[in-house]
């Protein structure tokens, strides 16, 4: 340690924290410190101390947060209660002044009571959101003394014009004799409601008029109706619940002066109609029908002349649709004889806003009210003249805005043949609806071909109510005809400008959803460089771009595997347990990775590998004195790049093995890059320290150039010097791994569905598809359903790395799983799911997507791909291959290595590749495509061999990857094996033979021509016939070994495994020269 650096353990002791806590702080600050002996730069110390102190202060502050939340909740309640007490006297005082305008009183009572008019139609989602807070009891509040005249408020509804269908009574402002002082909102199931969107009632106060109150009629108190805001409703309810004495007195006064007509609109709640109410409605409807057929007078009282009728609101309270004196008036039932509107008859001389309507005029049935904004109680049109009536008011009011709300288009019509109260009935059933029969045809003419038509069906949420459907036709004759509602042709509203797309959508379907013509979308696609037809499928990304051009949003619908595979919530800290570290051993080929693992496992894996090199990725669970460790052994050969990358991605720690006598090699650099890309910490093990030429300093120097600086040199990379052969330094290496794992705090939740990655996959002849799975979280049990890549399955059996059968596997446990539907790709994520149906659904969805991606790649034709397909016949030399390997990872490595061998003159085309034994279908495929079958660690059956001979298919077998690559290179040189040429060197004549014990016969020769070399091949000729062909074992001149003997000299020559040498034989020397066929 230098003067300007401090060790981690010393700083931890100084700050009074554990090394583990300090390690976490350093990790958050991106200060590299792997062990407690790591050093920290002096300039970093102030920042670290500030961070540790800030964390202590932050922990102290967090402890008080829950109390603050609780206290805030109490303050809200107190404030609401105080506000309620303060408002009651003000409201009474305000109500005592009759000349004060109602808007001012409403603002003084509670300013949020007056809501802004809604500018756009509400969706059902908005209605539900508004409806939810109304489930709590809502207390009615009296804001004036009973002896004062009631302020008259204008009610603007956000609902369509109603039929006399059953409707939920609003919450009463006054309390009936049988009810409690404040009536709460009933549950939805108990309300006889029309099946329509629930909308909040919004009240706009109007100017009071003393003349509006008739003599002899005591009016009930009228309440300013609050908008249905959840926060305000809850606050008011809390304030009343706290016990407001003044409110209690007002409620008692209210009980004495009960008026059955006065109701307070609070909110309309949708529910199914009550069967008892429906039966009563049907009876009343039949009576009304009989009266209408008889042409009788419709009771209800004659409207006084010139009565003041502020729009929608009568003096004395609110009159919802279908509500008449005496309570609920369902479905066109007659009003009791002599009945009157709740607010009383209109006195003479009253003012009705609007221009005077001509005497005797009437508003024909079915005439739509003009769209537009009505403000301030103004009613366009004219007051109905004396004795006038509105016959057959069955036309729906078109969509239009009134202040305080809106009336959606297509609302239910008013009951046919029902004149306004005070009017006189016309013909039975009223006058027929002009144009009612032709509205459907008219709306069809208005439809534009390129615009979306929105039809609100009769049985939909805005059509006939449920009790209308139960009643059936409403009459006979012309009245019996079904109501024909116009189909509104309109572009989608802004809130509805969304199209729903699955993984892909056709151009025609997209045009239909957007209300456009298909050629408009095709025009945009052409501008994007996509040649599309009306039936072309667009992926979701392209559809999003196209929809954006027209101002639409894309909503992805359909099956989503994320709903099943993505964890719903994070694991709670108390559910996490410590898991063993996953350590990947990486390095260059022949640097001793597997031998080092053998020494740790005390086994012999290397002996089982062909050629002594690792060609699979192996997972091993090792129990050491320092705890359990999971090792992944990766291949070092250059062809296994993908395997090394995969090993780095699913590991916690990488041990980089470098031979002390060899130094840093190409695959060593690649392993370092893979580990850095995966963000995995690296520990270096310098192996082969027992060799004479070991030079660990050279390794440290070369690795420092790659960014791995040893701790001895002031860096943070841990170096361990080991020898797999002598087991030197293994305990130190295991201890360093255990310390590093402790710093990383590796934890996982074992009590959840298993999730992991496939390390290796293969096809076993007896057990079917197998995969080595490293479980990373959860516990995998026998019988669990799972999905992996495009395959689903159920765990039939599990085996550990020793081949023993196990029932379950926890986090950081490698197991071999049996039960796949096919051979999965190595590196795929393995996820356990609830049942087989979900697994199969996800697998099928992935398979369809994969096929679509493959088809999309094939359909894309560029200039380069087009020209590459038109090579000349002389140059179009292609080597077709069918690759079969034992495991999926090896197949991937071989495929990649073989593809790299392609040159401009010879292309390699892999017709098919798969894991498992060579089958009959492989032979037939190779025969049809003139391909060579390459088998790696697999063998065919005798039947398959016979078929191969019949089909003249060449099968090559390999067990070492670099031999496979070399032979393919040779085959590419001339589409055949390398050419070997024999070169003549010289001749020697045998003049004498000598028999040497333990060696054999030695020929004494004289070189007659050329020369004879020691490594040359020889051919023994006797009377011109070749008797022996072999090699020279010894070549001596006198007693000295020589490399060659020139012409004219004598020598002694021994032949390999041949002693029948006779005087007079001729020995011809030659050598074989390999020459690759030129292309």
UniProtKB/Swiss-Prot annotation:
GTP binds at residues 587-594, 633-637, 687-690. Residues 633-636 are annotated as: G3. The keyword Cytoplasm applies. Residues 52-488 are annotated as: Disordered. Residues 150-184, 276-291, 348-370, 380-398 have a biased composition (Low complexity). GO terms for molecular function: GTP binding; GTPase activity; translation initiation factor activity. Belongs to the TRAFAC class translation factor GTPase superfamily. Classic translation factor GTPase family. IF-2 subfamily. This is Translation initiation factor IF-2. It comes from Nitratidesulfovibrio vulgaris (strain DP4). The lineage of its organism: Bacteria, Pseudomonadati, Thermodesulfobacteriota, Desulfovibrionia, Desulfovibrionales.
């Amino acid at each position: 340690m230098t003067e300007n650096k401090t060790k981690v353990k010393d700083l931890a002791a100084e700050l009074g924290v554990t090394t583990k806590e300090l390690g976490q702080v350093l990790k958050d600050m991106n200060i590299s410190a792997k062990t407690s002996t790591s050093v920290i730069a002096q300039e970093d110390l102030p920042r670290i101390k500030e961070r540790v102190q800030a964390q202590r202060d932050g922990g102290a502050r967090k402890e008080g947060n829950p109390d603050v939340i609780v206290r805030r909740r109490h303050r809200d309640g107190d404030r609401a209660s105080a506000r309620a007490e303060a408002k009651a006297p003000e409201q009474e005082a305000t109500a005592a002044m009759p000349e004060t305008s109602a808007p001012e009183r409403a603002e003084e009572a509670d300013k949020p009571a007056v809501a802004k008019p809604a500018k756009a139609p509400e969706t059902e989602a908005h209605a539900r959101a508004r409806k939810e807070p109304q489930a709590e009891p809502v207390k009615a509040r009296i804001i004036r003394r009973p002896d004062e005249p009631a302020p008259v408020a204008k009610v603007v509804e956000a609902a369509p014009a109603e039929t006399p269908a059953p409707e939920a009574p609003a919450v009463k402002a006054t309390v009936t004799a049988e009810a409690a002082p404040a009536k709460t909102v009933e549950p939805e199931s108990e309300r006889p409601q029309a099946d329509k969107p629930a909308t909040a009632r919004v009240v706009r106060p109007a100017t009071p008029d003393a003349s509006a109150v008739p003599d002899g009629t005591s009016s009930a108190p009228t309440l300013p109706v609050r908008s249905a805001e959840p926060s305000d409703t809850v606050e008011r309810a809390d304030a009343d619940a706290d016990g407001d004495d003044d409110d209690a007195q007002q409620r008692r006064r209210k009980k004495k002066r009960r008026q059955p007509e006065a109701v307070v609109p609070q909110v309309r709640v949708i529910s199914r109609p009550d069967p008892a109410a429906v039966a009563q409605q049907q009876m009343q409807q039949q009576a009304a029908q009989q009266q209408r057929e008889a042409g009788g007078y419709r009771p209800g009282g004659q409207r006084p002349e010139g009565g003041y009728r502020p729009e929608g609101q009568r003096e004395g309270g609110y009159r919802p649709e279908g509500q008449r004196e005496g309570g609920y008036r369902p479905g066109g039932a007659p009003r009791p004889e002599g009945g009157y509107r709740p607010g009383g008859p209109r006195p003479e001389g009253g003012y009705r806003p609007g221009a005077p309507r001509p005497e005797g005029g009437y508003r024909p049935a079915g005439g739509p009210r003009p769209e537009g904004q009505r403000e301030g109680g103004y009613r366009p049109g004219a007051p109905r003249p004396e004795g006038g009536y509105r016959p057959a008011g069955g036309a729906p009011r078109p969509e239009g805005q009134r202040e305080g709300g809106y009336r959606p288009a297509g609302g239910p019509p008013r009951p046919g043949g029902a004149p306004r109260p005070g009017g006189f009935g016309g013909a039975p059933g009223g006058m027929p609806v002009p144009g009612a029969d032709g509205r459907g045809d008219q709306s069809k003419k208005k439809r534009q071909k390129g615009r979306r038509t929105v039809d609100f069906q009769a049985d939909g949420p805005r059509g006939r109510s449920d009790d209308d459907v139960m009643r059936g036709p409403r009459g006979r004759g012309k009245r019996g005809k079904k109501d024909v509602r116009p189909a509104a042709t309109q572009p989608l509203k802004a809130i509805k400008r969304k199209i729903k797309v699955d993984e892909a959508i056709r151009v025609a379907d997209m045009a239909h959803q957007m209300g456009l013509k298909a050629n408009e979308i095709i025009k945009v696609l052409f501008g994007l460089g996509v040649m599309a037809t009306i039936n072309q499928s667009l992926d979701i990304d392209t559809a999003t771009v196209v929809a954006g051009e027209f101002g639409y949003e894309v909503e992805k619908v359909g099956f989503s595997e994320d709903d099943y595979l993505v964890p719903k919530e994070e694991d709670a800290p108390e559910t996490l347990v410590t898991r063993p570290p996953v350590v990947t051993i990486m390095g260059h080929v022949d640097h001793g990775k597997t031998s080092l693992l053998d020494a740790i496992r005390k086994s012999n894996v290397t002996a089982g590998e062909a050629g002594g090199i690792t060609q699979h990725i192996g997972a091993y669970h090792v129990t050491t004195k320092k705890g359990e460790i999971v090792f992944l052994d990766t291949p070092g050969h250059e062809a296994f790049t993908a395997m090394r990358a995969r090993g780095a991605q699913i590991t916690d720690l990488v041990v980089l093995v470098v031979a002390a006598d060899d130094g840093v090699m190409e695959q060593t650099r690649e392993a370092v890059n893979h580990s850095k890309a995966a963000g995995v910490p690296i520990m270096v093990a310098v192996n082969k320290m027992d060799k004479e030429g070991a030079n660990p300093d050279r390794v440290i120097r070369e690795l420092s150039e790659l960014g791995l600086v040893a701790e001895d040199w002031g860096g943070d990379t841990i170096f361990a010097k080991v020898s797999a052969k002598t087991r030197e330094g293994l305990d130190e290496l295991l201890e360093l791994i255990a310390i590093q794992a402790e710093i990383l705090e590796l934890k996982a939740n074992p009590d959840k569905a298993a999730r992991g990655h496939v390390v290796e996959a293969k096809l076993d002849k007896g057990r079917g598809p197998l995969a080595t799975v490293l479980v990373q979280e959860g516990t995998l049990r026998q019988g669990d359903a799972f999905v992996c890549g495009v395959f689903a399955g159920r765990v039939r059996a599990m085996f550990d790395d020793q081949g023993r059968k196990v029932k379950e596997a926890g986090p950081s446990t490698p197991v071999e799983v049996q039960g796949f539907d096919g051979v999965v790709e190595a590196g795929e994520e393995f996820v356990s799911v609830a049942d087989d149906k979900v697994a199969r659904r996800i697998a099928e969805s992935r398979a369809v997507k994969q096929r679509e991606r493959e088809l999309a790649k094939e359909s894309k034709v560029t200039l380069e791909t087009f020209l590459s397909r038109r090579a000349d016949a002389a140059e179009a030399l292609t080597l077709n291959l069918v690759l079969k390997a034992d495991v999926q990872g090896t197949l991937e490595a071989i495929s990649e290595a073989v593809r790299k061998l392609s040159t401009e003159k010879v292309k390699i085309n892999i017709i098919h590749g798969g894991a498992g034994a060579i089958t009959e279908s492989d032979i037939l495929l190779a025969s049809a495509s003139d391909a060579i079958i390459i088998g790696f660690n697999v063998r065919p059956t005798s039947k398959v061999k016979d078929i191969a001979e019949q089909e003249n298919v060449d099968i090559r077998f390999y067990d070492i990857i670099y031999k496979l690559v070399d032979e393919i290179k040779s085959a590419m040189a001339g589409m055949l094996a390398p050419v070997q040429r024999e070169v003549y060197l010289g001749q020697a004549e045998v003049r004498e033979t000598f028999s040497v014990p333990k060696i054999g016969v030695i020929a004494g020769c004289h070189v007659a021509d050329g020369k004879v070399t020691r490594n040359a091949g020889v051919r023994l000729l006797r009377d011109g016939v070749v008797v022996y062909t072999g090699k020279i074992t010894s070549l001596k001149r006198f007693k000295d070994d020589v490399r060659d003997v020139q012409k004219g000299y004598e020598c002694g020559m021994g032949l390999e495994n041949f002693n029948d040498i006779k005087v007079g034989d001729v020995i011809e020397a030659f050598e074989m020269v390999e020459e690759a066929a030129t292309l």
